[in-house]
Swiss-Prot record:
Organism per entry: Danio rerio (Zebrafish)
Family classification: Belongs to the TRAPPC13 family.
Pfam families xref list: TRAPPC13_C (PF23643), TRAPPC13_M (PF23647), TRAPPC13_N (PF06159)
Gene Ontology cellular component terms for the protein in this record: TRAPPIII protein complex
Source species taxonomy: Eukaryota, Metazoa, Chordata, Craniata, Vertebrata
InterPro entries in the cross-refs: TRAPPC13, TRAPPC13_C, TRAPPC13_M, TRAPPC13_N
Organism domain of life: Eukaryota
Name of protein: Trafficking protein particle complex subunit 13
Subunit structure: Part of the multisubunit TRAPP (transport protein particle) complex.
Gene: trappc13
């Protein structure tokens, strides 16, 4: 913390101290064998030390608390607390004392004073005390500006300021990845790394979705008594430089799921709300900005699967259900064609009319196929033609099925 001292001697003295949690006292135990030259000297010294734990003198952590010896670090999301004291060091009464505390950041100036009214008088050896609090929401350089104005007994008005500069650091490194599913679901993977020098207790990591989505947290596992437990265990500590991954599933709300054009254009997913605790329960909170994803491009016509079996029998027909959605802003007149591949064959009439499909409307079509080759086979060969514009849309590698032989050949 940098302090610019006032050049002129004043009747009042200003002191500013940061309020932080104390820390547990640590010592470095020194031991030796009984047959060594010091004998039991080190053990007796540790037992006489008031800072050690009785019965566990070799434990590094002691029972006593120590106050911080320096300004320490301030991290984004924590609460900055400071004690401000104005003391009358003179032998005369000072009048109309006004103490003002402002916090200057890179983007704004905030008034942190609890009261903006002046104190009528301050007698010798008396003081004015104030405690300020501020939740830090910006990183970078912060300057605490403390200004004091007063009037002497002779009626002279005096004024002085002190500046306290400190840096706000970033506590967490948050990285996100999006995965778009064919069912309009969006999976969010959030990687959170502790980039401080002390462990954190992760109290809450939640996703606040946008108005179009419902969210499901995938960070719990079901236990036997119908309750769920966190995948990270009961004591959710994040050590320095450790990274933890959180997973969320977002589903469109029913009123928006039917509007293909609306879901297609959505880029805002929501924001992460992270709450943690550090030394002796000191809390910090961080909210990310609105998370955005690259909206998937489906073109004018989207083809998705509503039903498909995982495993089918060799040379036995099986059914699938396709959903065709008009993602354009015009009405389409669609024609469906089915092209066979080497291993998968379509059953039915190719080149049939599907009729007109309005913008954002959907149509479900049941289809039948047959596979002539075993193994994992890809379903391809669907063609949709818009007869209005004479434009054809090709769909290959729509899905995969596992083809097995239902017959068991006798052993030779």
């Amino acid at each position: 913390m940098d302090v610019n001292q006032a050049k002129q001697e004043h009747l009042l003295a200003l002191k500013v101290m940061r309020l932080t949690k104390p820390t547990l006292f640590t010592n470095m135990p020194v031991t030796c064998e009984d047959r060594d030259l010091p004998g039991d000297l080190f053990l007796r010294l540790m037992k006489d030390d008031p800072s050690t734990v009785k019965g566990a003198e070799t434990l590094i952590l002691g029972e006593m608390l120590t106050l911080p010896q320096n300004f320490g670090n301030i991290f984004l999301g924590e609460t900055f607390s400071s004690y401000i004291s104005v003391h009358n060091d003179s032998s005369q009464v000072v009048k109309d004392i006004l103490v003002k505390a402002d916090l200057q950041t890179s983007s704004q100036r905030l008034n942190l004073s609890a009261s903006n009214s002046a104190v009528s008088e301050l007698k010798p050896e008396c003081c004015i005390d104030d405690v300020i609090h501020h939740e830090v929401k910006e990183i970078g350089t912060h300057i605490l500006v403390c200004a004091v104005s007063y009037t002497t007994q002779t009626g002279e008005k005096l004024y002085f300021r002190k500046f306290f500069k400190f840096q706000v650091l970033k506590p967490l490194d948050v990285k996100t990845k999006f995965y778009n599913a064919e069912t309009d679901e969006v999976f969010l993977e959030a990687q959170i790394q502790n980039i401080t020098t002390s462990p954190m207790f992760m109290e809450k990591v939640s996703l606040e979705p946008s108005m179009m989505y419902n969210v499901t947290e995938l960070n719990n596992v079901a236990s036997g008594d119908e309750s769920s437990e966190s995948t990270f265990g009961k004591m959710s500590y994040l050590q320095p430089l450790d990274t933890r991954q959180y997973l969320y599933c977002l589903k469109p709300k029913p009123e928006f799921a039917e509007k293909a054009g609306v879901i297609k254009g959505v880029t805002v997913i929501g924001k992460l709300d992270i709450v943690w605790k550090t030394n002796l329960g000191e809390r910090g909170r961080l909210q990310t900005s609105q998370l955005q994803r690259m909206a998937p491009g489906y073109g004018d016509v989207r083809l998705s699967l509503e039903f498909i079996p995982d495993t089918v029998d060799l040379e036995e027909p099986f059914d699938i259900t396709c959903k065709i959605t008009n993602c354009s802003e015009r009405t389409m007149d669609l024609l469906l064609e089915m092209c066979n591949t080497r291993s998968v064959h379509w059953c039915g009439v190719s080149g049939r009319q599907l009729g007109k499909l309005s913008p954002s409307a959907s149509l479900s079509i049941p289809l039948k196929l047959l596979s002539s080759v075993q193994g994992l086979q890809s379903i391809s060969g669907l063609r949709l033609t818009d007869t209005f514009l004479k434009r054809t849309y090709e769909y290959d590698d729509i899905a995969q099925v596992c083809v097995v032989c239902p017959y068991t050949s006798p052993e030779s």
